[in-house]
């Protein structure tokens, strides 16, 4: 089975996390920059429910972070997670392992057939 491995790290730990994943056998990845908050960050605050206020609070108080994503073989997930835990010991991070049931690649060309990479 394939797994969508998602590693959330603070911006300053991006290089460490990427190196750890590469050393553990990752072959490719993509990253998304975002600003994140944990429940402790807004503890004691009352967040207004209108979108402008909620977004404003995130912009003001959230921590810049990065989400590193990759599709990996299930057999590699534990060693990748262990490597991240070792290299980022004492740092804040989150690892999600999402099972993938199927991958379909759309070519965009009408002449080319779609291809099921994993099923």
Question: What is the role of each PLM region?
Answer:
Residues 1-119:
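Positively charged, small/polar-rich N-terminal and surface patches that mediate targeting and assembly
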